[in-house]
């Protein structure tokens, strides 16, 4: 599912992630534990395509984050500890906004929103 090969991310003259390799197979659960500045968030953001990295390769289900970032973003999500939500939008408006960014068609969008609204027992559409 997730394969990281020799990941290196540098900020200025500081290596935030230095030659990290990791393979997480389907069904496995991993946690990133470490002190502030250890590279946990940088690694996760790199996996999600939010941050560019200098060296290495990240594959999501065999798809390269560098070569096909949108395909990878469709399979993986990142929820930050301080999400930047738009206070002027409802939840449904925000989901439609994100669907617009990723060019999700109207039919698929409605199906997905309904599916997850039902799953989480939320009011929908």
Regions found by a protein language model. Give the residues of each.
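Walker A (P-loop) phosphate-binding loop of ABC-type ATPase nucleotide-binding domains
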Residues: 35-39
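Helix-to-loop junction immediately C-terminal to a conserved catalytic motif
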Residues: 48
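Conserved ABC transporter NBD signature motif
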Residues: 56-67, 71-72, 76
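Short coil-to-beta microelement around the adenine-binding A-loop and adjacent beta1/P-loop entry
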Residues: 14-15, 70
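Conserved ABC ATPase "signature" region
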Residues: 96, 100, 107-125
């Amino acid at each position: 599912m997730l394969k990281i090969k020799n990941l290196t991310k540098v900020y200025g003259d500081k290596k935030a992630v230095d030659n990290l390799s990791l393979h997480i197979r389907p069904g496995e659960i991993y946690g990133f534990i470490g002190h502030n500045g250890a590279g946990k968030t940088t690694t996760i953001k790199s996996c999600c395509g939010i941050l560019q990295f200098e060296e290495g390769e990240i594959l999501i289900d065999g798809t390269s984050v560098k070569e096909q970032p949108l395909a990878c973003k469709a399979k993986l999500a990142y929820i930050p500890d301080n999400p930047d939500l738009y206070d002027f939008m409802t939840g449904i408006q925000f989901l439609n906004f994100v669907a617009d960014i990723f060019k999700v068609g109207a039919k698929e969008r409605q199906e997905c929103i309904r599916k997850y609204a039902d799953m989480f027992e939320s009011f929908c559409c």
